[in-house]
Amino acid sequence: MANLKEIRDRIKSVKNTRKITEAMRLVAAAKVRRAQEQVLRSRPFADRLARILENLQSRMRFEDASSPLMEQRDVETITLVSVTGDRGLCGGYNANIIKRTEQRFAELTGKGFKVKLVLIGNKAIGYFTKRDYPVQATFSGLEQVPTADEANTISTDVLAEFIGAGTDRVELIFTKFINLVSCKPVVQTLLPLDPQDIADPEDEIFRLTTKDGRLTVEPGAGPANTEPKIPSDIVFEQTPEQLLNALLPLYLQNQLLRSLQESAASELASRMTAMNNASDNAKELAKTLTLDYNKARQAAITQEILEVAGGAAAVG
């Protein structure tokens, strides 16, 4: 059995580690609430914009319209946009996205497509650049709660690559935030856009309402498309191309912002859970070490008593 000093040092080290993990858990818990609220607040706008595009499609002949973001062409090159975090200590959050990106990369290259990567977050950047993957662009240092400016910077780069025919399809790989204890990596086609299939059937519908005199966001019930239909007698001054060129870039930027926000919320929730588990494990380990310390101390005392008794008997 280890000596008493070694056990005392280990107990002290474990308790100090627990203080750190507990502090990180509290920080993550405070930040995740803000990130969660940001995710919920952004959803009504995204939902409403998707419904507007759906209804416009039903009123106007978008299939005859021409927009760079809707251009369907033979797919030869595909860009994967992978969203991870800048830091670790968040359970399997980063590893799950990296694994899903590798799987998708292997699937596409196995079918003969040329694949390029756009990496968001230091974890993805560090992993893929060290393994000689074809990296098109990298972005890091995003805010804990991503902003529209950050999403616009990334979407502008991706959009320019698509319009310039540098890529034929763009897929987004990010972590969908479900709740504080559940999230999942998903793959979503970002470009080309299709107004006939603009809404994700798995998306919840969120509405901005008032409760007790305050604005709040609540999940909506009922059919997916709850947007009032556009009356058939309305005449639009703009052509379908003008409407699409105004709305689709906004929709693209919003989709990217939403994915960044959901990923950030998922990262913080994963970190909170990981630090909570680490704190619990440290507490249990400290208990076990304390028990070992007491046993070792008791054995040492017993040994000393036996030695004293043996010496007294020898003298007597």
UniProtKB/Swiss-Prot annotation:
MF-aspect GO terms: ATP binding; proton-transporting ATP synthase activity, rotational mechanism
Subcellular location as annotated: Cellular thylakoid membrane
Gene this chain is encoded by: atpG
Principal place of residence: membrane
Alphabetized UniProt keyword annotations: ATP synthesis, CF(1), Hydrogen ion transport, Ion transport, Membrane, Thylakoid, Transport
CDD domains per the UniProt record, alphabetical: F1-ATPase_gamma (cd12151)
Name of the protein described by the UniProt record: ATP synthase gamma chain
Family (UniProt): Belongs to the ATPase gamma chain family.
Taxonomic source organism: Parasynechococcus marenigrum (strain WH8102)
Membrane-spanning parts: none
Gene3D superfamilies: 3.40.1380.10, ATP synthase, gamma subunit, helix hairpin domain (1.10.287.80)
Cited InterPro entries: ATP_synth_F1_ATPase_gsu, ATP_synth_F1_gsu, ATP_synth_F1_gsu_CS
